[in-house]
Amino acid sequence: MTAVCQIVSTRADNLWAFETSDGRGIRKVVEYMFPVIADKRGWFLTPDVQYFDQWPVRQPSLVFAGLAFSRAEYLKMWLSLNADPGTEEVIRNFPIRQPVLWTL
């Protein structure tokens, strides 16, 4: 979803700023997921992916949201994660591997 916000947003229609009437939006999604990306032991549900141990990797959402919301900790986390996963299934679910190119 962050890739959609990054690619589709315009100055007139900024999807990063969109919120529903009850306050839901992409900012809340990233704020919810960031602590779990930082330390997946914080995930309180049963792991729902087959390759749970191979995650996280360099999520493009961290770059996009870090820039959109001026959150340096998102960018710092992105830099600390594995940029070149070797597990085929993780690679398949990691379609944007050079997110900085999408910010130019």
Would you name each region that the model predicts?
Residues A3-V63:
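Non-catalytic carbohydrate-binding regions of carbohydrate-active enzymes
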Residues R11, W43-L104:
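Terminal, non-catalytic domain-edge segments
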